[in-house]
Amino acid sequence: GVIYLTGNLLLLPRLGAALTVVITVTGQIIMGVIIDTFGLLGAHQQSFTLFKGVGIIFLITGIIFMNYVRRHPVNRHKNTPIVFWLLIGFVFGFAPPIQTTINSTLAQHTHSSIFASLISFSVGTIALFILTLVFNRSLKISSTHKTLGKIKSIYFIGGILGMAFVTSNIILMPFLGAALTTIIAMMGQMIMGIIIDHFGLLGSPKNKITSRKLGGLLCIAIGIILLRLF
């Protein structure tokens, strides 16, 4: 989890938000299918079929429709090693399905999804604490920002939402498999992202829903059906 979140922060200024989402989610889908197909990390093995392959194509197409924004010609030449960063983003995308599978197996050993989440977050917290001391060299936080003003209390609930997300993935993994669990969670993220953008919630700029985004959602829904039923 720490690798994925920190990796996104590294990729955002180099690839932009849209391309970062596209490449990391593609990595998530591919790794989820690999885990299910070969039964890795204690996951229940599921055979790979032609329908699943077509479903993956629909999913990736939908993700691109919903997130990809054409890069400006001027910026295209500034980031020369973009292929390198795309490859890094693809590899970072492997982390969530691996995390979900490991946490689900851990939950089976500990007989508790909540306790497995606690272990996962504790290890992640220690890792982030060390990274903060190494790179930030300070644990101080200012309650106000020069341009953004005072920090609202709602911005501190991210940890609670993360706990709910990780725990629900642990519970769903044995029933849906790594690939489908990742895809369902991803679709929920995208739908909520569209709602937040459309209404400008939580201080984000408004970005209206377009026919391209709706078409992307439809492609993703078709992909999920193909992966689930076949």
Predicted regions and their residues:
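Loop-to-transmembrane alpha-helix entry segments
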Residues: 41-65, 175, 199-223
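Alpha-helical transmembrane segments of compact multi-pass small-molecule transporters, enriched
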Residues: 23-38, 123, 127, 184-199, ...
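Membrane-interface interhelical linkers
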Residues: 15, 44-50, 68-85, 105, ...
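Hydrophobic alpha-helical transmembrane segments of multi-pass membrane transport proteins
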Residues: 1-14, 95, 131, 141-176
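Hydrophobic alpha-helical transmembrane segments in multi-pass integral membrane proteins
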Residues: 33-43, 93-102, 161-173, 220-230
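Transmembrane alpha-helices of multi-pass small-molecule transport proteins
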Residues: 1-3, 58, 116-139
